[in-house]
């Protein structure tokens, strides 16, 4: 998904660092968030939806399709919980969550360029939904690539300092030596991206 707004303005609109670099660190900004006049309930719901779309870099069509799938799901989870699970279990999001990429945008680029395998098969579709016990691996030929050198050094430091389990999500297991990610469980409510208010988004689409 491509946005045509200037990057800094987009971050100020949502008051979130969407690009993961120091350049867009809003804690160092002297400027106020871009805010419109007091919003109606519909306006609040719309803003929550826009934030979620921009955090996961999805088009309206893609994002709405996750709501439709969640609404039709006959599981024990609520619609908003199922919707978050669909978002969290995207391949590009899992790679980002495992700290194999600094941002979701970077993770999507890595997947699109076939840098990873899923269950030892090369993949290049960021939206693939992973399942419990799936194994994602960095391809061998890229482990020595300069592109990944700094990232791998960061992973090694995480591992040495015992910060690894904290930095990666509880529902995934990362092997920092083999450079693999194993899906251990379906993400629970406490594992979701906490800044998002998916209930408001469900209310928006339910109208």
Model regions: which residues?
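Short, well-ordered loop/turn sites that connect or cap secondary structure elements
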Residues: 110-111, 130
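Glycine- and Gly-Pro-enriched alpha-helical subdomains that act as flexible
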Residues: 114-117, 122
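The C-terminal cap of the DNA-recognition helix in HTH/winged-HTH DNA-binding domains
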Residues: 97, 112-113
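Ferredoxin-like alpha/beta domains used as RNA- or RNAP-binding modules
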Residues: 1-98, 125-207
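Beta-rich strand-turn-strand
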Residues: 101-104
